[in-house]
Amino acid sequence: MKNWAGNLRFGAKRYHTPHTISEIQKIVHDSDHVKVLGTRHSFNNIADCQVDLISLESVVPRISVDPTNREVTVGAGVTYGDISTFLRDSGWGLHNLASLPHITIAGAIATATHGSGSNNGNLATAVTEIKWIAPDGSIVAHSRECDGGDFEGTVIGLGG
């Protein structure tokens, strides 16, 4: 498997394409080292892993809007193209957009991908809660409200 440009080859022993969150939980639980691979829009090997790579391309995109709290909830595999269309059709929008519709929202958040304009915060600045799968397979939630300053370190990380 190669990156988007075809100039990097991924070296993972196993490549997983789960369809459900429970399948992802099992893979994470059973693996010694795992990374989630987005749309492979990486310019270097930081996204690579020597053991298990998980692709979210087969997980059904989940997007919901809570108009009362003015919040949008998305699954990790949702792309900018998915969310832009959904939000437009719902009368909503994002404060900043990356230029590539095929990259995932989770990937853009985790790498602090910039969008348009130097005065606009990246998408990670709008995240209020994040859920992730711990090594034991459990789902862990962190929020800006409950975790304060530590929250930013949870949201942005390059996947070392």
Give residue spans per PLM region.
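Glycine-rich N-terminal segment of FAD-binding domains in flavoprotein oxidoreductases
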Residues: 6-102, 112-117
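FAD-binding subdomain of flavoenzyme oxidoreductases
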Residues: 108-160
